C-alpha cells in the first residue's frame, strides 16, 4: 500500500471558527519564532558536553520516550523488543532497526495523541520527511534519520542552536558531580545549559536506594548526615554547588503535596527513625513533608526557585519495575490535596515574596477548587503548566479555563516541556504557543480582551513569564 503524505497544516490547533481563527493566526505570528526557554526538563547534559553524534533513530527517538513505549506496552509489545534498558543495566540483544520496525508497525496507536503531534513535527520539520511513518516506510525513516544524525548539522549543540533555545535546564540528583555542566562552561560554547537540584534520592525513605544514597551524600559533603543538623548542612552545601553550576531551581517529586513544620527536636527524633530504616509509611510521608518546608527555608537564603511535582503513583506495575526500573511508563496520576497539604509550609513562609514555589498537579479536579485560589492569594505561590498526562492540547486548554478566573495569567509560569526527548522540544513549545493563541483569540472574539492585550499576554506566556518565574 502506498504511504500517505506527511504534512503539517499551518492552522493546526487553531480555532475552527473563521473569525476567531484569524485572530489566533495574528497572535501566533507574534510568538511562533520567539526563543525557547526550557526551564525544567530531563535532557542529558552529556549530550551538550561531549557534542557526540546521536547513535541512531531508535536510541534517540524511541528508547528514552516513555510516552511512546508505554502505549506500545499497553498493546502487549514487550519492552525487550524495543531495546529498553533493564534495571540491572543489561539490554536484550535487539537490532535497533528491528526495534524501529516494531515501532513503525504500531505507530497508529499514537493517532490523536500529543506524542503523534510532537513526532510528526520532528519528522517533518527536523528531518524533512514527507511521507508518513508506517510498516512500509520504517526502513526509509530509520536510514534517513540515522544518516542525518551523523552529520554536523545534527550534533547536539547544532540542534540546540537551530531550535533557537536560549536556555535549557536539566535535572540532577544531589549526588551528581555536575562534571558535564562544568565541561560545557569550560568549552567556550555559548549555549546555556543549567542544572536543577532534585534531592529525592536522599529525601524519600521509601526510595529503593535511600540508604546507599544517604551514605554517598555524607561522603560527598563531609557532613555527618546521620544527624538532622548535619543532614540539613549537606543540603545547603550541595544547593550552593548546584547554584555555582547555573542552577536557579530545585525540583521535588513527592507522592503528595504534604508539608510539615516540626520543631527541631521532633524533626531529629523522626530523622533518627528514618536513618535506622524503621520508618512506617506515615513517618516516611511526614519526613518528606518536613524536608519540603526546610527546602523552602533554604530557598529564602539562596534564592533557588522551588518546584513541586506531586500526586503520582510511581512504578505502579511492580513486575515491570523489578525488571526495568523507574521511568518506564508505569506512573499513574492520583487524587491530590493541596489546601491542607501545603498549609504548614505556607503558614511558615507563604507570605514571604522572596519564596517562589511553583506547584504542578496531575489531578485536574484541583485546578479551580484549590490551586488557582491558592496561587491567586499567596505571594509565594505560582502554578506550573499542564503537566505530563495533561500536556495534550485539551489539557492545556482545560488548565487555562479552570485557572484563569482565580489566578489570572500572571500567577502562572508559561510553559515547561519537561522532557527527555530533546528533538521534540520545539514541537512541544509550538503546541503550547498555538493553544495559548487559540485560547486568547477566543477571549478577544468575546470582547473580554483587546487584541493588543492578548498579544502581550501571548508573548509573556511564551517567553517572559518562564524567564521571570525561574530567574533565568
Curated annotation (Swiss-Prot):
InterPro entries for the chain: Metal_Hydrolase, Uronate_isomerase
Gene3D superfamilies documented for this protein: Metal-dependent hydrolases, uronate isomerase, domain 2, chain A
Associated pathway: Carbohydrate metabolism; pentose and glucuronate interconversion
Gene Ontology biological process terms in this record: D-galacturonate catabolic process; D-glucuronate catabolic process
Database matches in Pfam families: UxaC
Keyword Transferase: no
Keyword Isomerase: yes
EC number: 5.3.1.12
Catalytic activity: D-glucuronate = D-fructuronate; aldehydo-D-galacturonate = keto-D-tagaturonate
Keywords: Isomerase
One of the record's GO molecular function terms: glucuronate isomerase activity
Family annotation (NCBIfam families): PRK02925.1 (NF002794)
Family per record: Belongs to the metallo-dependent hydrolases superfamily. Uronate isomerase family.
Protein name: Uronate isomerase
The organism of origin for this protein: Xanthomonas axonopodis pv. citri (strain 306)
Name of the encoding gene: uxaC
